[in-house]
């Protein structure tokens, strides 16, 4: 186990970490990296070894700026995961599904100057807005 400071330092250096959920939620580990440091190598690693959805966590404010709406008005999933409609970058991609295209989409979304005009909906990468843990762990 690492300290919170060590994890934050690793993320700032562009490294991936594994964050484990609470036992009362999904009780799983998630591969996590700083979105502004993502590249095709990280996307490839996540797709090959994580074998799940590659998602980007955004604040509610950022979702609003990008015009991201919830995938459904009535969230009936067990964990109430707040997925939005998926997106892709409007520029700099081809099919949108390659590791490079997904990294480009993530970088476009987290760009401080990004607007609704920066992205297209739907796209191949899933997004979710920021949700706070129900129990503080740090």
Task: Give the residues covered by each predicted segment.
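A phosphate-binding glycine/aspartate-rich beta-alpha loop in the early core of alpha/beta enzymes
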Residues: 28-87
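Generic secondary-structure signature for well-ordered alpha-helical cores
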Residues: 9-16, 48-51, 90
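Short, acidic Gly/Pro/Ser/Thr-rich loop/turn segments
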Residues: 26, 63, 92-94
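A generic local secondary-structure boundary/capping motif
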Residues: 6-8, 43-46, 70-76, 95-96, ...
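N-terminal, positively charged regions that mediate nucleic acid binding
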Residues: 1-28, 32-39
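Hydrophobic alpha-helical hairpins/lids featuring a short glycine-rich hinge
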Residues: 76-127
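Conserved small/polar residues in nucleotide/adenosyl-binding loops
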Residues: 127-134
């Amino acid at each position: 186990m690492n300290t919170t400071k060590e994890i934050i330092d690793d993320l700032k250096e562009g490294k991936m970490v594994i964050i484990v959920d609470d036992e009362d939620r999904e009780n799983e580990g998630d591969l996590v990296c700083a979105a502004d440091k993502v590249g095709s190598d990280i996307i490839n690693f996540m797709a090959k070894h994580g074998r799940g959805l590659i998602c980007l966590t955004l604040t509610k404010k950022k979702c609003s700026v990008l015009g991201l709406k919830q995938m459904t008005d009535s969230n009936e999933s067990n964990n109430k995961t707040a997925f939005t409609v998926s997106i892709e970058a409007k520029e700099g991609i081809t099919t949108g599904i390659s590791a490079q295209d997904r990294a480009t989409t993530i970088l476009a979304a987290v760009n401080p100057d990004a607007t609704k005009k920066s992205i297209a909906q739907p796209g191949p990468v899933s997004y979710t807005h920021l949700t706070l843990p129900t129990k503080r762990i740090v």
